[in-house]
Structure formats: structure tokens, C-alpha cells
Amino acid sequence: MNEKEISEIRRRFRADKSNITHVRGCYINEKQEIVSQFDQPLSLLPQEECENMLSVLRRTLSGTLGKNLIEMPFTTAQVVDSDEHRLLMALRDSKLTDEEAVRMFFEKVIASYRPEGTYLILLANDTYDVPYRAKDGETLEDASENIYNYVLCTVCPVKQTKPVLGYDVPENTFHNRDIDWLVSAPQLGFLFPAFTDRSADIYSAMYYCRSASESYDEFIDAVFNREAPMPAEEQKTTFGTILGDALNDACSLDVVQTVHSRLCGMIEEHKASKDPEPLTITGRTMKTMLTACGVPGEKAEKFEEACAEQFGADAALSPRNLVETKKFEIETPEVQIRVDPEYSEWIETRYIDGAPYILIPAGAGVQVNGVPIAITHPDVEYEEEE
């Protein structure tokens, strides 16, 4: 799925667009016990509550592709004959009316997802009459291409509110508000089947994870029977470690600045092009980039080999997971320097009197702890004011 296809399905989760008739739910306490289950018809909900329910579901299709939204492919063997794929198909094909399939799915999630507090599992089914899209991009609502039948799973923490004072308008007094339980933003979930090339793709699901540092290995293994992908934050850390270890003494400030600048440039160009397909690079691409930066060939080769070992051979990585586009940071054990990436080239390293220094040009407007300071030339003498 690309960004346009994700956006197209996300727009379905509105009262005037959706064909969702009911939502199945399972509420689990901190002891991993089922507190209650429900099958809620949306038509019986007040409009505001219906919109809130759809809003919670819609957020399972939010975030950045490749970071929060990750494609989960199934093998041909899984599609032909596997328990995990058969269960997902049963949920979809029955439109969540297969009680045994729903029960098995809830039990599978409960056994593989163990947060600290209580949480809610939501299941929704929608049937989308996909409108025809002409070559010029214009959508013809009255001309259907195919029917896309899918299920969306959302797992949300349920958190207790804190006791607070509330104002009672009729009585003109303040009272403690009752403690309540509120459904928080989705922590994880998935869409099945994927909406690839604007049609159902039973060979893939779109997995959602709110945190870029969590992987939820057990959940992914239970639902998709595959190894969890490396979280985005771990990808960034691993990439930096590989870069430093492989290049060793060739990993200079100039090299890191250039790599950061070029990856950020690729991200900006991709954004400006409005290409819906995700931007990816490989270890081979990075090897070419490093060679262009002046890194010796054998060290660039070592970097490519380390990438293949850590991420997989020919792994397609998102540059957004490898660099911070809005931050350039330099750290020593005693000092931390943060610079707008646009001005990172102002920083340089230099040996002065045999000691290594990090140099930053200081213009006007320098402050220390909020206090404006003057930086004077050592040869300039102060003139005392009379």
C-alpha cells in the first residue's frame, strides 16, 4: 500500500462514508481477564458517539509509512493453508458474524499482548465499493471498479482518569469529578487484507504500531506468524552503529554531515514530488553514497556487508527511519550540541595546539542561560565608561 491508498481507506471512517454496521469489542483487565464483550450497532449510537468510535478506528491508519505503518506480507504457503491466514479470512468473509472466529481471535490477542493496564480490542468490517479512477487521477463515484471487503483491528489502552475538581454551573460550586475510564489512542492494530493497487491483497496486511521503538514480537508472531520487523528507532541506532564501526577512523564529521544532508535531501525531494510510493534505500545505495563522500572502497564495502547482516540482504530501508530531519546533534561525555540541520555545515573539527576541538562560528545574538553575552577579540581592550 502507498500513502494515497492508505488515505483513501482512512477517509472511509466517517459517518457519511462508512458502511460499517457494527463494531465487535473485548475489554480486558490488568490480569488479562475478559471483563466484557460487545457487538455494538453504530446505527443505535448518537451521532457524536458514532463519530468518536470511527475516529478511534481511523487512527489505526495514521502515522508514517515505514515507521508506524508497516506492510506484513504472507507467503503463498500461508495463504493456501495456514491457521493464521484462515482465521483472518474467516473474520473478513463472515463480516465478523462468525462467533468462533471472533472468540479465537480475541483469545489469540490476549495471549500475545500483555500491557501493564487494561485495554480494549475493537474489530470493524467495511465493504467499500471502490470508484473507478481515470488516468488523469479523477475519481468517478458512479463507476465502480471492485468491492473491497476488509476488517480493521484496533487495540487501545483504557486509562483511569485522575480525581479533579469540576465546576457545577447550576449550583455554582466546585465538586470532585467521578473517576472514569477513558479509551486512549490505539497502541497497535492492523488492516486486512491490504488495499494494494486499490484492490484487496490477501497476500498482505497493513500493521500499525503507535510507538517507533516498540515491536510487539509476540503479537506479530501470533497474528501473522512471522518475525517482527525492526522498530524505526532501533533501525536508526543500528544504522549509526554500523556507520561508526565499519568506517572507523574514516567516519569523520564531514562524512556524517554529508550522509545526513543527502538523506534529508532525498526525503525533501520525495515529499516535493508527491510520489505516493514509499521512499527506500538499500545498503548498496549507501555504499555508493559513502564512496562519493571519499570513504575508502574497502570501508564502504564493509558497511554494505554489515547492513546486509543486520537488516537483511537487499533490505529496503526508509531514510526517515535513519536520520532526524529536524535535528543535528553532537555529543561528548560533557557537552551536547544541537544545531538546525540547515546550518550543520557551520560546525567543524580542528586540532589546536595538539588538542581536538569542535568549532562553531558565533555571530550576533549569543545567549548563555538566557543572558546576552559579548564575544570580544583578545586584542581588543575594554574602555571603561565614565
Mark where each language-model region is:
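Long, hydrophobic alpha/beta structural blocks
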Residues: 14-326
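C-terminal, beta-strand-rich globular interaction domains
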Residues: 291-386
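Short, isolated positions in well-ordered beta-strands
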Residues: 12, 86-88, 101, 337, ...
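Soluble regions of membrane-associated proteins that transit the secretory/organelle pathway
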Residues: 2-7, 31
